[in-house]
Amino acid sequence: MVSNLSQLEEVNVLVSDANWAWPEALRRIFRPRGVNLLVAESASEFVHIIEKKRIHTTIVDMDSEQSNGLATIRIIRIEYPLLPCILLTSTAGKSLLGKALQLDVFSVIDKPVDMHILREQLNRLFLKKYNSSLFGDPPRIRN
């Protein structure tokens, strides 16, 4: 079922915590669009947050110090099999891509993350899943 985000009160994206500037970089994409950024440190925290709030997508770091990204997605899939997940990784080999495909990961993005590519993938995801161009390019002003 496709739902239109214009009917929703809030849009929530849940991401892996990081010891680098990752959350702040995401805020630069999300804040102008009115998207709430929620951060989880572990697989159990991901599930706990998903149980409490409507989450529209997750962005999971394969290289998280707290938990393996694929293991986190596997745990999410137990209770939330349709929740879209994007996986970030510094080592996107065939084995990892095969496992991500088995877990129905929406997209695998290489690290360091190109924020333009991430925004494009979020736009594809939100168009497909929610019929929303929330992450599309801002309209250009013509003179």
Regions found by a protein language model. Give the residues of each.
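Alpha-helical interaction/dimerization surfaces of two-component signaling modules
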Residues: 28-33, 49, 99, 121
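Acidic, metal-coordinating helix/loop segments flanking the phosphotransfer/catalytic sites
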Residues: 39-57
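Conserved phosphotransfer cores of two-component systems
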Residues: 51-53, 76-82, 103
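Conserved phosphotransfer microenvironments
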Residues: 59-76
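A Lys-centered signature of the CheY-like receiver
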Residues: 111
